């Protein structure tokens, strides 16, 4: 069991790199099938995080009221407090940048006052819910927002899984594949969160390991994921192919990390404490500035665009980790609060 948990910790590293790839927002015109293929693969990252969260929410014992209360109290520290703090960061960065320009460059205060006025008039609470296109202020943390909601609703889901069994999974699968887009991305209860969190609950409730399975299952999973990836890329307007690839691709991720050498697993797992920090900070300013700097060093061509797309996520992830380790030296207690005690 410890080996499998270590593998799950190790999986978080490639998953977070894939998340950074997602936020590169590639276009087909700029990077062609390279970008489209990698971006499609990257979409499995968030579902994997939800599966892991659902799997470990239940534990080995039935979900009782007392256990539920204990778990919610822990989630206040591990999820809610970091969520509230991190969603202040983009606004603080913007305010800080404006103040710097006002003091050192003589810039007018108009932009800063407009931002603060709009923030107040729109409702400050939107920072933590739907500030940016249905996402919170620190946009990648929509995942954390939805995960908090999933944890609150866990007893409902647990009862649904317990009584519905495989039928419950089939119902959720149909909703996941065929639910209209306008319903699929409701803030707090996105279909991705509901489906994959419940998959994690179902697997744990039925004693099915995330890592492992028969050799036939593993080969079938990897083969099916590969075929669906090709189809999803070639027929990129067919949403159901895209959804099916993400589903099978998520399970394929657990298979592939199970195939990794023990030395690779141990190496990847060492970075597990940094993953939440990278997730929270990369979109606030690191990815943008890294992209600008690397972009100046590459030729303005198709090759340059592809190299930019392939290189920047790794550099941005490394920079985020560097900030994490620096903060761990300077202010480990504050860092621990920001990372939910991780």
Features from the language model and the residues they span:
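Small-residue-rich segments of transmembrane alpha-helices in multi-pass membrane proteins
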Residues: 82-86, 225, 275-282, 342
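Interfacial loop-to-helix transition and helix-capping segments at the boundaries
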Residues: 34-46, 131-146, 180-196, 230-252, ...
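Transmembrane alpha-helical insertion/packing segments
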Residues: 1-43, 181-197, 201-226
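Alpha-helical transmembrane segments and terminal signal-anchor/GPI-anchor hydrophobic tails
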Residues: 192-195, 208-277, 284-293, 299-309
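A generic structural signal for nonpolar/aromatic side chains embedded in well-ordered alpha-helices
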Residues: 20, 203, 268-271, 278, ...
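Membrane-cytosol interface segments of multi-pass membrane proteins
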Residues: 1-173, 297-342
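Hydrophobic transmembrane alpha-helices
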Residues: 55-59, 150, 154-159, 193-209, ...
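Aromatic-anchored segments of alpha-helical transmembrane domains
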Residues: 17-24, 171-184, 221-235, 278-285
